[in-house]
Amino acid sequence: MSKSKCSVGPMSSVVAPAKESNAVGPREVELILVKEQNGVQLTNSTLINPPQTPVEAQERETWSKKIDFLLSVIGFAVDLANVWRFPYLCYKNGGGAFLVPYLLFMVIAGMPLFYMELALGQFNREGAAGVWKICPVLKGVGFTVILISFYVGFFYNVIIAWALHYFFSSFTMDLPWIHCNNTWNSPNCSDAHASNSSDGLGLNDTFGTTPAAEYFERGVLHLHQSRGIDDLGPPRWQLTACLVLVIVLLYFSLWKGVKTSGKVVWITATMPYVVLTALLLRGVTLPGAMDGIRAYLSVDFYRLCEASVWIDAATQVCFSLGVGFGVLIAFSSYNKFTNNCYRDAIITTSINSLTSFSSGFVVFSFLGYMAQKHNVPIRDVATDGPGLIFIIYPEAIATLPLSSAWAAVFFLMLLTLGIDSAMGGMESVITGLVDEFQLLHRHRELFTLGIVLATFLLSLFCVTNGGIYVFTLLDHFAAGTSILFGVLIEAIGVAWFYGVQQFSDDIKQMTGQRPNLYWRLCWKLVSPCFLLYVVVVSIVTFRPPHYGAYIFPDWANALGWIIATSSMAMVPIYATYKFCSLPGSFREKLAYAITPEKDHQLVDRGEVRQFTLRHWLLL
C-alpha cells in the first residue's frame, strides 16, 4: 500500500494526522480531500497512518525536555556492569585486542538494534507490547521482554540495597570491613591475608578470610548461617530496611511517569561521571596504579584466535546496551514524533562504550594498587561481579586517607548507577502494560505501586541468610538466553515480517531522512545472524550456576529453566492464541496475523504484501 495514496470506497472518510510542524504544540490534523467518481481519496504524501487514534495520540505525555530523555537512556544503559564486567573482560581477553571484536559487534549489531528500538517506540508511541500492532502474531515478544524486566527487578534492586547498606556503614570513624574484631568475623579472619586464587576472588572460602570478604559474606549477607538454597532463613532486617528505601525511591521516581523520572535522572545519570572522574584522579596517584593500567591495556592479538574472546565480546555488546528489555521502546514512546532518534542512538551508544572503557582505568588503577599492596600478580586480584565492588574495591578504599569519605562517595555512585537502571526496568513493565490495558492507564499511580510492591515481596527471598543463592540463580537464568531470544524475534519481526522498507519509511516520516543502505543491511541480515549466533552459543556453552564452591541442586537448576522458559514461552503462546482467535480460513488467519493492523483493510481486499516475494527481498 502506497503511503502517498490511500483509496477508500464510497460513503467512507479518512482522518490522518499530518506530520508535526511544531514539536511543542498539539499535532495538527489536515484533511486533503479530492472528490472522485468512486468516493473520497487522500492525496498528501506527507500524511501519516497514525499508530493509534488521534485521542490516544493527544493524551500521550512527552518528556519535558529532550535532555530528560537522553539522560534516562544513558542512565539505564550505563549501569553496574559497565564498572564490574567490561574492564575485567577486556583484561581477560587480550587487553586492547578485545576492543577489536567489541567495537566490530557494536557497530554491526549493537548500534543498529539500539536505533531500531528507539525508532520502533517513537513511531508507534506505545510500550513493548503495543508496538507489535506492526505484526500482531508476534505480540508475545512484547510480553516476553516485559516479563524479563519484571524478573530482573527481583534481584537487581537487591544490589542497590547492598550498596545502600554499605553507604550507611561508611559513616563511621573506622570502616567495618578493615578489622577482624567484629562480631561477625570468624577465627580464620586475617588482616594480612592475600589470596592467590583468581577463581571467584572474594567469593570463595580462600579469600573469605579477609575482613572485607567476611564483612560482605558474614556481616551483610549472613551467608554462614545458611547451608544452601534449601535453607534460606528469615530476611535480614537491615537489608530489608534498605530494600524498603530503594522501593520507596523507585515508586516516587515513577508514579507520575516521565515527568518525575525525567527529573530524577539529572542526578542519577550525571553523578557517576563526577565520582568516576574523582576516583580516577585519586587512583592514578596510588603506588602500583600504572602496573594495573598497563595490564588493562596490554595488547595480545593472538587471543583473537580464540572463540571465547569473540563470544565474550558479542554477549557484552548485547547486555551492555540494554536492548531487549523494552526500556528503550518505552522511553522513546514518550518522544515527540519528529525527534531525531538516529542522532540519539549514535550519541547514547557512544557514551555507553566510552564509559565502559574509561571505567577500566578507574578499576585497574586500584587493582594495581591492591596487587602491589598484597605483593601478588594483577591476575590474582582481577575479578568481576559483586566481588569487585563489594570486596576488592572497598578494601582498597579502606587503605586511603579519608577512607570513610571515599567509601561514601563510591557507594553513592553505585546507588545512582543502580537506581536509574532499575527505574528503566520498572518503566518498561509499567508502560508496556498500561498502554495495553486501558483500565491500568486510568489508575497508573496505583498500578505502579502494585508493581514495586510485587518486586519488593519477591526480592525478600534475596535478603535472607541464603539470599545470595537465590540472587545467583535469578541472575543466571532470568535474563540470559531468554533476553537474547527476545531480541532475535524482535529483529526478525521488524526487519522481515514488517519489512525494512516499511520501517525505513516510518523513520523518514519522523526524521525526514530515510536510513541508508548500511542500516537497512544490518537490520535485515547482519543483526539477525549475529543474534542467532549468540543465542546458539549461549545454549551450547551453558554451564549450571554456582556460588564459589557451592553447587546448586538439580531442582534449583530446573526452577531456573522454568523461569527462563516462562518468558520465552510468551511468543508461541500468544501466537497460537492470536491465530486461533482470528476469523476466516487458514490463509486469511495468517494474513491478518502477519499484516500490520493499519493495513487489515488491504487483507479484506486480498492485497497482502507479506505474501509476495518482493516484500521479503526488499531492502
Swiss-Prot record:
What's its job?
A: Mediates sodium- and chloride-dependent transport of dopamine. Also mediates sodium- and chloride-dependent transport of norepinephrine (also known as noradrenaline). Regulator of light-dependent retinal hyaloid vessel regression, downstream of OPN5 signaling.
As for family, the record states: Belongs to the sodium:neurotransmitter symporter (SNF) (TC 2.A.22) family. SLC6A3 subfamily.
> Where is this chain primarily localised?
membrane
| Summary of activators and inhibitors of this protein | Inhibited by mazindol, cocaine, desipramine, GBR 12783 dihydrochloride, GBR 12909 dihydrochloride and nomifensine. Inhibited by zinc ions.
Provide the tissue specificity.
Brain. Expressed in the substantia nigra and ventral tegmental area, regions that contain dopaminergic cell bodies.
**Membrane topology type, per the record?**
Multi-pass membrane protein
**Any idea where this protein resides?**
Cell membrane; Cell projection, Neuron projection; Cell projection, Axon
Q: Which residues lie on this side of the membrane: Extracellular?
A: 172-235, 287-305, 376-399, 542-552
* Catalytic activity, reaction form: dopamine(out) + chloride(out) + Na(+)(out) = dopamine(in) + chloride(in) + Na(+)(in); (R)-noradrenaline(out) + chloride(out) + Na(+)(out) = (R)-noradrenaline(in) + chloride(in) + Na(+)(in); dopamine(out) + chloride(out) + 2 Na(+)(out) = dopamine(in) + chloride(in) + 2 Na(+)(in)
Transmembrane segment boundaries = 57-95, 96-127, 128-171, 236-255, 256-286, 306-334, 335-375, 400-441, 442-465, 466-498, 516-541, 553-582
**Which residues get glycosylated?**
181, 188, 196, 204
What would you give as a GO molecular function for this chain, any one? Answer: metal ion binding
Task: State how changing residue 403 to A affects the protein, per the record.
Answer: No effect on dopamine transport activity
- Binding-site residues, Na(+) 1: 75, 78-79, 417, 420-421
PROSITE patterns per the UniProt record, alphabetical: NA_NEUROTRAN_SYMP_1 (PS00610), NA_NEUROTRAN_SYMP_2 (PS00754), NA_NEUROTRAN_SYMP_3 (PS50267)
Cytoplasmic membrane side: 1-56, 499-515, 583-619
Q: What is this protein called?
A: Sodium-dependent dopamine transporter
Q: Where is this region: Interaction with TGFB1I1?
A: 560-589
Q: Which PANTHER family match?
A: SODIUM-DEPENDENT DOPAMINE TRANSPORTER (PTHR11616:SF38), SODIUM/CHLORIDE DEPENDENT TRANSPORTER (PTHR11616)
Give the binding site residues for chloride.
316, 320, 356
Residue numbers binding dopamine: 79, 149, 153, 319, 421-422
Keyword terms, alphabetized: Cell membrane, Cell projection, Disulfide bond, Glycoprotein, Membrane, Metal-binding, Neurotransmitter transport, Sodium, Symport, Transmembrane, Transmembrane helix, Transport
User: How the protein is affected by changing residue 359 to G?
Assistant: Reduced dopamine transport activity
Residues flagged as site, Contributes to high-affinity binding to cocaine: 105
Where is Na(+) 2 bound in this sequence? 77, 79, 82, 320, 352
